[in-house]
C-alpha cells in the first residue's frame, strides 16, 4: 500500500520507468551483479550489455545514490557508548547476596534427594503464588463491597414511559 501511494505521487514517466525495471528485475539483477563484480575487480574487458540494460543500471545507480543520500547516518565519530550509560547495580543492605546452588548432601547416585528438593522448591513457589492470588482475590472482594455502596437509585417510572409501549414491535 505504501509503495502504491509512493508511485501515485511520482510522475507518469517515473512510473513507466519503475514498471519497466520491475518487469525486468530478475534478469537485470543477475546481469547487474555480474557487471559490478567485474567493475570492482577492474577487469577492462567490455561486457556485452544492451542499451536497455545500461539504462537500467544508470537508473538503479541513481536510485541507490538517492537512497544513500536520504538515509545517510549523521557525520561524526561513531558512538562507542550508549546514550545513557548503565549504572552499576547497587545492592541494598536489606538484600541478601545470591548464593550459588549447592547440591544437597548425599551421594550423587541417589537422584531421589535431588528430585525431592526440586519438588519441595516448586511447592514453595506454588504456595507463594497461591498466597499472592488469594491476596488479589481479597482485594477484588473489597472492591465489590465498595461497589455495592455506590449503587445508583432505581429510575422512577415516568408517564412518558407508557407512550413507548404504543410503538412496541409486535410479532
UniProtKB/Swiss-Prot annotation:
GO annotation, cellular component aspect: virion component
Similarity comment: family membership: Belongs to the asfivirus H171R family.
Organism per entry: African swine fever virus (isolate Warthog/Namibia/Wart80/1980) (ASFV)
Keywords: Late protein, Virion
Sections of the chain in a coiled coil: none
Entry protein name: Uncharacterized protein H171R
Subcellular location: Virion
Residue ranges, compositional bias (Basic and acidic residues): 141-160
Amino acid at each position: 500500500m505504501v509503495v502504491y501511494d509512493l508511485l501515485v505521487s511520482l510522475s507518469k514517466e517515473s512510473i513507466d520507468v519503475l514498471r519497466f525495471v520491475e518487469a525486468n528485475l530478475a534478469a537485470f539483477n543477475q546481469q547487474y551483479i555480474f557487471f559490478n563484480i567485474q567493475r570492482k575487480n577492474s577487469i577492462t574487458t567490455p561486457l556485452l550489455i544492451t542499451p536497455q540494460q545500461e539504462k537500467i543500471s544508470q537508473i538503479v545507480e541513481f536510485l541507490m545514490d538517492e537512497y544513500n543520500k536520504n538515509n545517510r547516518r549523521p557525520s561524526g565519530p561513531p558512538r562507542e557508548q550508549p546514550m545513557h550509560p548503565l549504572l552499576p547495580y547497587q545492592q541494598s543492605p536489606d538484600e541478601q547476596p545470591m548464593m550459588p546452588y549447592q547440591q544437597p548432601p548425599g551421594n550423587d547416585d541417589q537422584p531421589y534427594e535431588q528430585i525431592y528438593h526440586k519438588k519441595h522448591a516448586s511447592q514453595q513457589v506454588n504456595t507463594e503464588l497461591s498466597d499472592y492470588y488469594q491476596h488479589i482475590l481479597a482485594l477484588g472482594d473489597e472492591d465489590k463491597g465498595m461497589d455495592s455502596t455506590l449503587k445508583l437509585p432505581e429510575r422512577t417510572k415516568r408517564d412518558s414511559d407508557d407512550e413507548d409501549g404504543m410503538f412496541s414491535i409486535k410479532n
